[in-house]
Every structure is written in C-alpha cells, then in structure tokens.
Amino acid sequence: MSELKPLVIGDLVVEKPIIQGGMGVGISLHRLAGAVAKTGGMGIISAAQIGFREPDFTTNFVEANLRSIRREMKLAREIAPQGAIGFNIMVATKHYDMWVKEAVKAGADIIISGAGLPVSLPEYVEAAYAEMEKKPDRRIKLAPIVSSAKSAMVICKMWDRKCHIAPDLVVVEGPLAGGHLGFSLDQLSAYGADTSDVPATYDREAYDREVKAVIKVVEEYGTKYGRHIPVVTAGGIYTHEDVMHQLELGADGVQVATRFVTTQECDASDAYKQAYINAGKEDIVITQSPVGMPGRAILNPFLSQIKGGTRPAIKSCFQCLEHCDIRTIPYCITMALVYAAEGDTDHGLLFCGSNAYRAEKIDTVDNVMKELTGELA
C-alpha cells in the first residue's frame, strides 16, 4: 500500500487528501463534518438552509440560518478541535454574502462554493474580516467548484483581475456527482452520465481529459502567484481505486460525499440512509431543479409526481434562491430537501451521487476513510 500524501492548501495541511463533500439540506452538519475531520480528512458543513430545525425557521429564516452556522461550526470543533472544517455555500442562494461572512466569523478553515461561479466570494470574505475585532491566526481558504477548464479559467481570471488573488484550492466536480450538477442536460448525455446504466455508458476518458485541462489552467495561475494551487476532483469517487485514479491524473486530493451518507455519523435521518441502501441502479435519475440546474437523485413518489407533470402545492416561500419564481417553479427546493432530511422519503428530494446504489450497510466514518485511503486493503 502506498501512503497518500497530505493535502496541502497553503498553511492548512489536511493529513489525508479526502474532503467530505457538502450535502444539504441537513445531510452534512456537525456530526459528519466533525467525524471526518477527526479521522484526518476535511469535514464540510452544508450551509444550505442550515437552520431548518430552528423553531423560528419559517418566520425568521435568515437569523435561524446565521445562528445555525455558528452552532454547527462550534459543535464540529468540539468533535475535532485540531481538524480541518469548513462550509459549502451555494452561490445561487439568496443572502449568499451573509452566509459567507458568518462562516468566516464562525472560524471556518475553508469555504467551498459552487452552484454558480463565486465571483464575489473574496470581497465578502474581506468584508467579514473588516467587521471582526480579532482576526484569525490563519486566513480562511477559498475554493470555487468548477466543472470544466472553461469555468476554471473564468473564475481564476475574474478573481485575478477583480481582487488580485487566485483560489487557494479548486474543486473539479464531474458529471457523476450528486445533487446539483454544473452541466447542461446535453453535456450529461454527451458523457453518457444520464442513462439508467451509468457505469456502462459513462465516458470516463473524456472527462479525465477535462480534469487534466483544469489542472493545466490552475497551474498557470499558480505560477503567476508563486505557489501551488491544489486541485481536488469530485463526482463518482467511491473506492480506493477511484481515489488512486484521480491522483494519477494529477489531482492533489478527492472530494467524496455519497459514500459518507450511509455512515452512523451522517446527520441524515435513518430513513434517508436506508433509501440509499434500498436504491437500485435504475432508481438513480437526473431531474431539473428550481435552482436552474440538473440534479441527480433517487426516484421516489415525489420525483415520479414531478415527472408526471403534477406540481406539489407550495404553501410558503423561504426566499432561499436569488432567482426563483414561485409561480413557475416545479416545486419548492427548500421543502423538498427538508422533507428528505427529516425522513419523509416519499415526499422529499433524495439527492445522491451515481454510486448511491452500491451502498449495502450502515458503516462508520473511520471505516470509510480507511477504505478510501487503502488502509483496509
């Protein structure tokens, strides 16, 4: 067994080059993020409607979310005081700037941001520092999520010109990922990532070439700023062999999400975890999200209803997305994800990665980390 090198992000060193991907609503909170960080990986808390369990969420969701950002980080730190812990914050969410600033003030090590290009992320971080009386000893790290060399070039160029900085880390999320995907339906089809038998149809070599192209773009900006900018790949990474394949492509680490759902420490309900275990290959489908992006999820009565053209009643609007028309959206993304998080697997949206059907049991974070790193091989 070859020992994996740590993931080095400037002055932040992650012992094992495994980032646990952010999953919302309520799937990766303090328990999962803290457990992953405790085992030497990087734990990521999803900020998406993070305050959904707060008693005032429906009447004062902004304060409920801000309060929960602080609390979840505090609780994760109690689990892993020296661990690497951060937030995943979606660009498409309303009040994005507020979530970013609160994550900085809460003491996050990193913000990973996608579902749109995080053009203004550096400015919001600087605004947070300006409001803080005591600055942290180590600056927070900023990591955009990209899906192509083109999007990597755009965000690097914009941060360079606008803020005179480069990313600290770049996450390349491929077409096998779960949840919201940075691809059009046509692009997913071109990669063979939208079928009922993705393992047989997916063109891995084609996306491997794209990963290498992203690495090349990032290297150019690393050279300009005189430092190495690590690239982490995500999407469909389930085994140690998958991890090694990504590292052989030139990645510095991997981001894994789906594999951690069926662990004891995952913050999801038992019913949510069981839905993964019960799912077959043919149950994992592509759907269109109100966010305006395709998403990968488990087919259930809720999605069957949507596919059949029936629109669930939307009782209230949580103002969760920057661009959302309650009159035309197929369903409320907040309520669909909250139902799922609470265990209503018939009426909720069960986001998952392409390998969710491979889950067979409830495991532990420690075992999953050891399998991914090859320690159990």
Model-derived regions: residue spans:
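Active-site entrance/lid segments in N-terminal catalytic domains of soluble metabolic enzymes
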Residues: M1-K224
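Conserved active-site-proximal phosphate/metal-binding subdomains
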Residues: I19, A177-V232, Y238-A377
